[in-house]
Amino acid sequence: DLALWQKQFGDTPLSVSVNLSSRQLIRRDLVSDVRSVIARSSIKPRCLRLELTESLVMDNPEQAAHVLTKLKKLGIGLSLDDFGTGYSSLSYLTRFPFDTIKIDKSFVDDATPKRSVLLRSMVNMAHELGLSVVAEGISDQSDALELRQMGCEYVQSFMFGPPVAGEQVPRLLKEQIAASQPARA
């Protein structure tokens, strides 16, 4: 589907993120399967992103490091999902080849005065390590604006719309592209 959408909306950068399960991560043929999907679908590897949770990586850190390094060599993106909620060490941010962290919704929802300090610290740390940042579970425009001002590149939220089936994506993209075009007089 992604390759078709890329042809249909050539000037619009499109990518897809896929959650990886622990069972998939330990499969011996995972890397060759991903390589095959990329070749078969004719998508650019950089348009595919795999998302893994901290706990998934922690189940077997040596195996995870080995597999993730091979996957990264294919040119795909790797995201550390639910960042900050697991029992990992910050050293894993340098040990594993992630290029993005996804700050867990619990930090965005936190109503304590320390919320902004924690969020800003995570965004700054990620950037210092060369990682991009996605904040999950944004509840309103003020959250989105605050995170943008902190330097968070992406936000993810049902506020922007619910998940949709693949056949609905072209219509949604057309609507978003039309809405982003300047009005003509």
PLM regions: where:
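Structural preference for long, well-ordered alpha-helical segments in enzyme cores
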Residues: 1-3, 33-34, 67, 122, ...
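Short catalytic/binding micro-motifs of nucleotide second-messenger systems
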Residues: 1-8, 38
